[in-house]
Amino acid sequence: MILGLALIPSKSFQEAVDSYRKRYDKQYSRIKPHVTIKAPFEIKDGDLDSVIEQVRARINGIPAVEVHATKASSFKPTNNVIYFKVAKTDDLEELFNRFNGEDFYGEAEHVFVPHFTIAQGLSSQEFEDIFGQVALAGVDHKEIIDELTLLRFDDDEDKWKVIETFKLA
């Protein structure tokens, strides 16, 4: 079973992000807009209850987090991915760190760059065309997210499904 942890924003911000993703993100139908807290990790089916309990314990003391999407950015030249950058806060970093150590299904492969992906799977030409448009449009959105979402990848439907949400203090 493949799981992941994410912060999922309000419906209104999901709609704003999805207005780009529908056009520019080939993964659009697989998952809602989100900030990844724990990248996909694999567990045995029988370990799900244990993972749920570990998540509950690890979020203890973490307050609801402010998410501030500040501008369009990209992972170029490493990757032709365009995203809305989220300002990194101590609370966001703490949440990420609690789930990305050897004691919870391994360390993160990448440095924590909180963001909402809006375009991926682009050719270099597509990237150049789209990035300019998105950067000009800009973004400045703040909201409080008070739940951490545990997701499971459903192979049959080829998409991520919510298993459980956990209230942040």
Curated annotation (Swiss-Prot):
GO MF annotation list: hydrolase activity, acting on ester bonds
Name under which the protein is recorded: Putative phosphoesterase SAOUHSC_00951
Top-level taxon of the source organism: Bacteria
Record-stated family: Belongs to the 2H phosphoesterase superfamily. YjcG family.
SUPFAM superfamilies from the UniProt entry: LigT-like
EC supergroup of this enzyme: hydrolase
UniProt short sequence motif HXTX 2, positions renumbered to this chain: 115-118
Active site feature: H34 (proton donor), H115 (proton acceptor)
Organism from which the protein derives: Staphylococcus aureus (strain NCTC 8325 / PS 47)
